[in-house]
Amino acid sequence: LKASVITEKLDLTEREAQQFWPIYNAHEKETSAIRFEEIKSIRIEIRENIENMTDKKANELLKKLSKAENKMHKSRLEFANNLSGVLSPKKIILLKIAEDDFKKKMMAELRKRKKGRN
């Protein structure tokens, strides 16, 4: 679904698509690992232990979270740099718009489903 939204918005040529998708998929894999393995585990630990957490432990978790977020930022910068030789600047902007639109659409769908269950 996401791939079709991106493909439609970017109107990739065959050559662009052949170069773009491996870069995009590698980036998605990397950011998903950071988001779900690092950031999520830190947030779970914070939620489960916040009531009895010492300042020392809170500081440690803040540092871990900051490190993971910096890693995510670095990954995004590398991704944009890698795309610069494949897509025009306009298409890179269109990619960001397509991803944002997709997220909004998915969030709206989740809210709709959640509302339907209540």
Q: Where would I find each of the regions flagged by the language model?
A:
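Amphipathic, charged alpha-helical segments and their helix-to-coil junctions
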Residues: 4, 9, 26, 73-118
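Amphipathic alpha-helical segments
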Residues: 5-86
